[in-house]
From Swiss-Prot:
InterPro entries: Cupin_1, RmlC-like_jellyroll, RmlC_Cupin_sf, Seed_Storage-Functional
Protein name: Vicilin Pis v 3.0101
Cupin type-1 domain mapped to chain residues: 354-517
Location of region: Disordered: 62-93, 129-154
Organism for this UniProt entry: Pistacia vera
Biased composition, class Basic and acidic residues, residue ranges: 82-93
């Protein structure tokens, strides 16, 4: 009943205001009086409703007066336009103020002139504030660009860039902040996050689920990952080289089954709620990790679990050791046994299981390195996320590339070793300060040292090279996003793109004879992996001796 009365009051008030607006020939005060009078004479309204109606009239009147005043000020401020005064909104503020003041002199009466001048000055101050704000924004954007240029390589991440999400005596989880936090150039990776899990021997990662689709790669160690899907348990014994897809919302838990070695898992996450932001939810747990069951009222839990309050309190208050705890040998043996039937891909219908990258023959291999690559047919869950996984092992002193990907952006993690990365980047080029005119872009060499746990990104289309040190092999895990239809274009060695071009195209592009171009680009007889620059310098030094 109350809601109907409110609706009627609102409807009546709107009708009254429309009626009053029609009294355009009447003065403003009579218009307000007429509105209030209509409120008073309504017999179906009590005193409170009549008062609300009158307040509505006053609110409408004030808003209408405000709009009229703004229009009047705009007219005074820009009244010189179209009158032959060569006055426009793009002229400097001082001139606009002067023109406005001149218009005020035409006003009748001292008070009208004074009010007009005051409005001109206020408008001038407002315009100056807006101009200053706009200029500050431009300077801030320029500052951001300069900051990115000053940053040696915004595509490389080291230990200091990671944050720790979980840390206990039995292990930790570290996460790389959103890629865009480092540089706006990484906006293409805004919806992805990268995390590392390190679990000590016989450690147990308690059950949880995430609001993110994820790809796990076991970079070291062995263990068991158990997923709960549609009231069925799938347990997978995993080892180095295994790829596992965990769907968003899927409960899972992990145990390190080794008694001596740590378990290392690299996780690429694609959040499903907020781009670049994901949460971990713990059901089984207590105070640490906090169980989401504790968020519900006791009455709800008692009814849902059909258990008295005192028992619920005991259950959800015991766990305080964190999200990674120690398991006994007996518990590990029980959890490492196969779940409800075999679950390794591709022997189980719809199961996503696992795929081991190292069981494939390398797609590229010579004395200087090996490249292992997954394909969508190897592990179909990758196709759903449009992600490919690869692993490169560069022999010490060797190098891979230069090459570039046509569509895929590479997120690379150094698993072992050290070396150097070089990227040709047009975005951070300093050519705009060189004063030299060019018909195309200029490129800046982004060079960085990389080592175990370094992360680097190579955007699509950017040529790059990785060089291993002379001390040990350089092993790199790569996630390539936007992988569907990607083509790798090699820039040196066998099958490089220059060799395929016509002689005339080479001559026109390099402004030299085609034979000379062929001598340079046809000399390297290896493919993809080559002898690195350090080896070459070392051998030349020995030859000079």
């Amino acid at each position: 009943m109350g809601s109907r009365t409110k609706f009627c009051l609102t409807l009546f008030l709107v009708s009254v205001l429309i009626l009053c607006a029609g009294l355009a020939l009447a003065k403003t005060d009579p218009e307000l009086k007429q509105c209030k009078h209509q409120c008073k004479v309504q017999r179906q309204y009590d005193e409170e409703q009549k008062e609300q109606c009158a307040k509505g009239c006053e609110k409408y009147y004030k808003e209408k007066k405000g709009r009229e005043q703004e229009e009047e000020e705009e007219e005074e401020w820009g009244s010189g336009r179209g009158r032959g005064d060569e006055f426009s909104t793009h002229e400097p503020g001082e001139k606009r103020l002067s023109q406005c003041m001149k218009q005020c002199e035409r006003q009748d009466g001292g008070q009208q002139k004074q009010l007009c001048r005051f409005r001109c000055q206020e408008k001038y101050k407002k315009e100056r504030r807006e101009h200053s704000y706009s200029r500050d924004e431009e300077e801030e954007e320029e500052g951001d660009e300069e900051q990115e240029e000053e940053d040696e390589n915004p595509y490389v991440f080291e230990d200091e860039h990671f944050t720790t999400r979980v840390k206990t005596e039995q292990g930790k989880v570290v996460v790389l902040p959103k890629f865009t936090k480092r540089s706006k150039l990484l906006r293409g990776l805004e919806k992805y996050r990268l995390a590392f899990l390190v679990a000590n021997p016989q450690a147990f990662v308690v059950p949880n689920h995430m609001d993110a689709d994820s790809i796990f790669f076991v970079s070291w160690g062995r263990g068991t990952i158990t997923k709960i899907r549609e009231n069925k348990r799938e347990s997978m014994n995993v080892k180095q080289g295994d790829i596992i897809r965990i769907r968003a919302g899927t409960p899972f838990y992990i145990v390190n089954t080794d008694e001596n070695e740590k378990l290392y898992i690299v996780k690429l996450l694609q959040p499903v709620n907020l781009p670049g932001h994901y949460e971990v939810f713990h059901g089984p747990g207590g105070e640490n990790p906090e169980s989401f069951y504790r968020a519900f009222s006791r009455e709800v839990l008692e009814a849902a679990l059909k258990t008295p309050r005192d028992k619920l309190e005991k259950l959800f208050e015991k766990q305080d050791e964190g999200a990674i705890v120690k398991a006994s040998k007996e518990q590990i043996r029980a959890m490492s046994r196969r779940g409800e039937g075999p679950s390794i891909w591709p022997f189980t219908g719809k199961s996503t299981g696992t795929f081991n990258l190292f069981k494939k023959d390398p797609s590229q291999s010579n004395n200087y390195g090996q490249l292992f690559e997954s394909e969508f047919k190897d592990y179909p869950p990758l196709q759903e996320l449009d992600i490919m996984v690869s692993y490169v092992n560069i022999t010490k002193g060797g190098m891979s590339g230069p090459f570039y990907n046509s569509r895929a952006t590479k997120i690379a993690i150094v698993v072992s070793g050290e070396g150097r990365l070089e990227i040709a980047c047009p975005h951070l080029s300093s050519s705009k300060n060189s004063g030299q005119e060019k018909s195309g872009p200029s490129y800046k060499k982004l060079s960085s040292s990389i080592r175990t746990d370094s992360v680097f990104v190579v955007p699509a289309g950017h040529p790059f090279v990785t060089v291993a040190s002379g001390n040990q092999n350089l092993e790199i895990l790569c996630f390539e996003v936007n992988a569907e239809g990607n083509i790798r274009y090699t820039l040196a060695g066998k099958k490089n793109i220059i060799e395929v071009m016509e002689k005339e195209a080479k001559e026109l592009a390099f402004k030299t004879k085609g034979e000379e171009v062929d001598k340079v680009f046809g000399k390297q007889d290896e493919e993809f992996f080559f002898q690195g620059p350090k080896w070459r310098q070392h051998q030349q030094g020995r030859a000079d001796e």
